[in-house]
């Protein structure tokens, strides 16, 4: 639902499809190939902390899809390369942003909860003021459109000078490695 709201309100987000896992896997593959192309990101609709998230090529798509068989619905979206930027919003105010440079392919579960994964946190984000204000404003707009309260963290990719909102987290982590507390302590 959130992606439909983003698209309706002209917030860039990757093209996506949602499937019920009971569908024939080869039919899913054909639809993904036709409407999205590869690579893609597959993930369960109802998980967090990057649990069950895979970046897939044509070659490993079905193999990774089978790993998600315990989930009823699967979100499949076009993979957007680029820089990972996270934005925190608190009580309808722009709290700040952080860039992540994971050693792994993306900021996955291990990178989020294990300091030895070696993800580099860059704060302040190294973009010009105009782009920083733009990404903060997009995150605030998404927060308000979804009628969120309290704190949210929006995950973006910055690619070819455009921000793509991947998702908005309504219950961002608050551990020692979590991003919202780090953003708050900087700002």
Locations of the language-model features?
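Active-site nucleotide/adenylate-binding loops and adjacent lid/helix of ATP-dependent enzymes
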Residues: 1-82
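ATP-dependent carboxylate activation and anion-phosphoryl transfer catalytic cores
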Residues: 10, 128-187
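Generic secondary-structure signature for well-ordered alpha-helical cores
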Residues: 11, 37, 70, 102, ...
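A short acidic/small-residue loop/turn micro-motif
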Residues: 21, 102-103, 171-173
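Short, flexible turn/loop "capping" segments at secondary-structure junctions
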Residues: 44-46, 115-116, 176
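Short small-residue beta-strand/loop micro-motif enriched in glycine and branched aliphatics
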Residues: 50, 119-122, 176-180
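Phosphate-binding site of ATP-dependent enzymes
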Residues: 57-134, 158-164
């Amino acid at each position: 639902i959130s992606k439909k709201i983003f698209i309706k309100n002209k917030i860039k987000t990757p093209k996506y499809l949602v499937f019920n896992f009971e569908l024939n896997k080869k039919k899913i593959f054909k639809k993904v190939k036709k409407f999205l192309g590869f690579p893609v990101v597959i993930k369960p609709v109802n998980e967090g902390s990057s649990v069950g998230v895979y970046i897939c090529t044509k070659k490993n798509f079905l193999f990774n899809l089978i790993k998600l068989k315990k989930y009823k619905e699967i979100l499949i979206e076009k993979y957007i390369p680029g820089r990972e930027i996270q934005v925190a919003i608190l009580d309808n105010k722009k709290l700040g942003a952080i860039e992540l440079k994971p050693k792994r392919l993306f900021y996955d579960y291990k990178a989020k909860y294990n300091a030895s994964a070696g993800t580099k946190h860059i704060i302040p984000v190294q973009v010009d003021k105009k782009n920083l204000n733009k990404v903060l404003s997009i995150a605030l707009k998404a927060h308000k459109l979804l009628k969120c309260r309290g704190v949210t963290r929006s995950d973006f990719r910055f690619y070819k000078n455009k921000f793509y909102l991947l998702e908005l987290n309504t219950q961002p982590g608050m551990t020692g490695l979590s991003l919202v507390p780090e953003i708050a302590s900087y700002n």
